[in-house]
A protein has these predicted regions:
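Conserved small/polar residues in nucleotide/adenosyl-binding loops
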Residues: 171-173
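Conserved NAD(P)H cofactor-binding loop of Rossmann-fold oxidoreductase domains
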Residues: 57-59
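Conserved N-terminal Rossmann-fold NAD(P) cofactor-binding segment
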Residues: 12-49
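Rossmann-like NAD(P)(H) cofactor-binding subdomain of soluble oxidoreductases
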Residues: 67-132
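Glycine-rich beta-alpha junction loops
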Residues: 15, 99-101, 123-128, 149-157, ...
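Short, surface-exposed amphipathic charged segments that create phosphate/polyanion-binding patches used
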Residues: 131-140, 158-167
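Short beta-strand element of Class I
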Residues: 8-10
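N-terminal Rossmann-like NAD(P) cofactor-binding module of classical short-chain dehydrogenase/reductase
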Residues: 54
Length: 173
């Protein structure tokens, strides 16, 4: 809302009331935002002229269940989402944020038939943001001055290359 990066935001959910409620909540923040964005609950057909579709749907991860255990459940969910989006005439970019994110990004790539540069996964970007925030708290610096990344496959095999972490572009961790 505050970055004014789009003129329309459409929320699609199998639970239509939830999508409507979330769209209403976000819309109520518009009077305080520097944009005239339109926010609404919608249908897959609304994706026809979208530049970006963010997929964050999926089965919940149960206690003791690995991200890879989610694969079969989420494959079914993604099949029911990607096909109607493609059928709408969507010709933009997919951004995948559902676990297991790296594998689900490949699933969207396969199901959509889109070129690889139009199917992107969030990967370890959220983990990197969390790491940078925790480091900024620990070292009492602005998070924007922390340059550290989590790399690898999102999940149990990701890691931090500590020798590459920087604070204020001066201090090597």
């Amino acid at each position: 809302l505050n970055q004014n990066i789009c003129d329309e935001l459409v929320l699609i959910d199998i639970n239509k009331e939830r999508a409507w409620g979330e769209a209403a909540d976000l819309s109520h923040g518009l009077p305080f935002a520097p944009s005239s964005m339109k926010i609404k609950a919608g249908e897959y057909s609304d994706c026809s002229d979208a530049d970006l579709v963010v997929i964050c749907a999926g089965a919940p991860q149960l206690p003791g269940e690995s991200r890879r255990d989610l694969l079969q459940k989420n494959y079914k969910v993604f099949s029911s989402i990607v096909q109607p989006i493609i059928a709408s005439g969507f010709n933009g970019v997919f951004l995948v944020a559902s676990n297991p994110v790296d594998i689900m990004t490949q699933v969207v790539y396969t199901l959509s038939g889109f070129p690889a540069n139009r199917v992107v996964g969030s990967g370890t970007s959220l983990d990197s943001a969390r790491l940078r925030h925790m480091m900024s708290d620990y070292f009492h610096v602005n998070p924007r001055n922390v340059h550290a990344y989590v790399i690898g496959e999102h999940g149990d095999s990701e890691f931090v290359p500590w020798s590459q972490a920087l604070i204020l572009s001066l201090i090597h961790i």
